[in-house]
Every structure is written in C-alpha cells, then in structure tokens.
C-alpha cells in the first residue's frame, strides 16, 4: 500500500500518451530496482500553494532554502528536478507549463503567489544509477512499455535533452569514482596510451581538476566547473582552454564503459566495439547508450602563461568595436601560439602551455598596449599549472544559473581569419549582431595546433599566418606539439569543421520567468537570424551541437557534416528499437519518436511540448 500511494500521484500527473506504463508496470520496475524508483517533483514546488491546478501545502522552510540556492550551479546539479538552464524544466511557449521562481530575485512572490506550479517538461520518475543492471532494467522497461528514457548527468543541455515530460530519467551524477593510471592500456589493446584517469559518469570538471592536481597531472577539459566530464561534453566534442595544443575531449578519451540499449554492459575503445567507440567520440549524448565511466589521457602538470585583457566598464562603443576588431585580427597569430580561452568586446582571458613569460608578453604586446591606452587592464603572468588558472580565474567568473538561456554558435574556418577581406566580412557580421542586441563572443578553443595522423595541423607547418601577426611560430621556441596516435582523420565523429578552425563564434538570448510569448518569439527569431547569416558567411563549416539553439535547419549537416550517414547507420545497429531519442540527435528524424528535449516547442499534445516556438 505504501508503494502504491507513493507512485500513484506521479502516474495521475502524466498525460494520456505517457501513461502507457501502468501502475503495475512501475511497481514491478521499482521492485526490480530494490525500491529505488522515485517520482520527480519540481524544484520550487515547496514555494507554491497550487500544484498542477490542485491545492498544495507550501513548505516555508524548504522554500527559503531553495530561494537561497536557486541560482547556484553546484546546488542545481545535485537536485533531481533542477537543470542549469530552466528551459529544461518548462514548456517555454506556454507560460503555465512551468514551476519557476524569478532567477533575478528568487524571493519575488510574484512568481509563486496564486500561481499553479505545473510539471512542465520534467520526467515522471528517476533512478539514481548505481550499477549497470539499473540501466539494463530501465531499457527493458522502456522496450516493454514504450516509455521515453532521458539521461541526466549534470543537466547543462541548452536543448533540454536531459529532461522530457513523462520520461524515465536515468541520473548518473551518483557515479563519482576516480582512478589515476600511471600507465593505461585499454581493454583488448596491446599498446598503452600513457597516463590516464578513469572517471565515473557523474564526476564534474571541478572534481576531476582537483583530483588531477592531487596526482600532479592536467586533465584537458571544459570551463564549466559543474559540467560532467563523461556526459554530453565529451560525447559531442568537448572543447576547452587547452584544446589548442592538446585536442578536444573526443581526441583524448581512450575508453568508455556503457550499457547499450539492448541492455548489455560493454567496453568500447579502439580495440573492441571500435565502431561504437567512433560513434561515442562525437556522435552526441543520449544516443548510443548510457555511459557509466570514461577514461582520458592526461598531461603532466606544468606552468602556463595567462593573458588578461579588459576594457573599463565605461568604454565607448567605438573602443569596444575596435577591441573586437583586434580579437578578430589576432585570432590566427594567437592560435599559432596556442592561446586558448574566451573573448568578447569587453574582456578576454587566454592561456597557453607553450610560451614562456617573455614570449607570452611579446605575443600579447599589441593587445596589452591597446587596452591600457584606453584605460583598461592588461597583463601577462605565469601560473604554476592549469589548476591555478582554474581556481584563480575560472571559478570566480562562474555566472548565476537557473534562467532561460539559448545559445548560437558557428565554427569559423581559418580562411575567414587568414585574409583582410575575410576579417572584414566577419567584423561586419559582428557589428550586425551588436546592432540587434546580441553580444558576440569568440571561443578560442578549437584544436588548432593539435596534430595526429592527418588531421589538424602541426605548428611546424602553419600556412595560415595572418598579415597582422607579430608572433613567431611556436615551433622555434617549444618544438612541435606532441602528436597523438589516437588522433586521426577517421577516429572521431563530430563535425570535421573543428579541424580547420581557429575560433567559434557564439551569442545567446534569454528571457525572464514571466516573459510573454511574443517576447520569446522575438528573441528566438533574432538568434535564428544570426545563425543563418553566419552560415551564409561561412558555408560548409559546422556548429557544436552542445551549444547550438533548437531551431538549427539542416542540423544533421551542421552538427556532423559528412559523418552523419555513418552515425545514422550505427544508431540503427546499436539502438534498433529507438529506445534513446533526443532533439536534433542522430536518428531523431521523423514523427512519433520518443524524444527528450522538446521543452521549447509550441504546444503540449499528448504529454509532449510539440510544434514550433518560431
């Protein structure tokens, strides 16, 4: 009786199309899982007196605690029903389909007074995955009942792929083991890949950077402290500050442990299940299986040079535009010196593991002169390790979360940076973005110098020097960047555009918790227009699926280029029943798919947020 009372409310909350699984089905699954199946309720529910249009008793103490932590990323990733970007919790086109506080002021009573807290796009139930058998049970349940499965690692997906109304959520954050290998040989392989770390699927960058530092090595990862290192980041590409010299996440991962949709517990690497390994190295999350752990090569801990460039807050628009011009002009020269990081018209932070302090100062001299001449701050310093950069610069710059954010990105080919005419076209596009209220940024995080078996480029053979370059080749100072045999033209499946690019252009839009439908549509249309314009500027390039908006046209080509056909074939091989599906993921074409990540679509029909916002 106790189990029935616990599960029934969530069953009753599901729309008809997601009630194919009976109460008996859910109870049977709960028994299989040793009573570890739990209902999902909205994070902010304790603040509301109405839930799904029925009376509900608020909990003031619980509400105050939620309000205190509502915009904290570390708090959110550890909450079952919280996502870093709140579009994953809502059906954006329908204001009533949400249970949100005001992220600008979580104590604002206007968000929850006399308003119904509705389930939105949250899953129905979740499992805290502890063993491979948990995932096997979930896949068997999904095959029997036609229930959608969503996979939640840290919940950072801009497209809401890790949520889904009525779905069964597999939460992997609880898998947090860490192992350091002085020398690692993948299963069934004969050749070791060198120093490596094996990470449970739930380990995030803050945790792995700390662990790596304790073992005097460097993990090459992303900039979001709470992003999972084994989730969508590495499965889709995975870029970061050190990618210039050491490659993307997909270049560095040497083995995955996962459960495939047939329920089998597998190891995938270059020596066994090699086609699956290829698909996992860029084919996207929530597509080919549920990752339990991943193993990545690491670098020795070593000093790096950091450049900090910031204009004063009162900088004129013309000064900001000139600074953005400088970033465009120096993207290629800085890429030659392995400078990696992020820049926009206000500030830039870059780091390189290849230059000494005097060399770094020479490389950055023009930029430092510019910002200091305009009343800003510019300097270069040596840090003892990437971990010092992470703790000193990345952690303090982490922004508040819990609001709606949609991203646009396009990988800009070297050819646009290499000529004066290309730079002019790009700057004209950046000016247009500013004129419509977007804040363009450049991610200097492509694998520009990474070299391996025919892809990327060695810094002993750079042929794209811009006429604006004042730096010398890193090869004369540091030798060539270490080539890795695990690289190679055919070994990863993300968009090939990564291999011929020096930067990624990004922008984002967001809206308030109480934004009207017309306001949402206007912002979304602006973002879409920006992506269409830059695609015309750089046709044949691609986008990073993790940081793309949900309205990308011809997304198969944009996200995977010529790799898509093989990925689609492998999707049919490894998931013939289509038990895993998500928005704009491999194999998601067609109607009637069990997709996650539909939270921004236009109307709720049969339990799904369907149609188009724009």
UniProtKB/Swiss-Prot annotation:
Residues of the signal peptide: 1-19
Pathway membership, UniProt: Mycotoxin biosynthesis
UniProt enzyme class: oxidoreductase
Start-end of Low complexity biased regions: 456-480
Region (Disordered): 453-495
Disulfide bond sites: none
UniProt entry tagged with the keyword Glycoprotein: yes
Domain FAD-binding PCMH-type as annotated: residue spans: 119-301
Sample GO molecular function, one term: oxidoreductase activity
Residues that carry a glycan: 30, 53, 72, 114, 314, 329, 461, 465, 478, 514
UniProt EC number: 1.-.-.-
Alphabetical UniProt keywords: FAD, Flavoprotein, Glycoprotein, Oxidoreductase, Signal
InterPro entries in the record: BBE, FAD-bd_PCMH, FAD-bd_PCMH-like_sf, FAD-bd_PCMH_sub2, FAD-linked_Oxidoreductases_BP, Oxid_FAD_bind_N
Cofactor(s), names only, from the UniProt record: FAD
Job of this protein: FAD-linked oxidoreductase; part of the gene cluster that mediates the biosynthesis of the cytotoxic leucine-containing cytochalasans, including aspochalasin C, aspochalasin E, TMC-169, flavichalasine F, aspergillin PZ, aspochalasin M and flavichalasine G. The first step in the pathway is catalyzed by the hybrid PKS-NRPS ffsA that utilizes 8 units of malonyl-CoA to iteratively assemble the octaketide chain before addition of L-leucine by the C-terminal NRPS modules. Because ffsA lacks a designated enoylreductase (ER) domain, the required activity is provided the enoyl reductase fssC.
Family statement: Belongs to the oxygen-dependent FAD-linked oxidoreductase family.
Protein name: FAD-linked oxidoreductase ffsJ
Organism: Aspergillus flavipes
Gene label: ffsJ
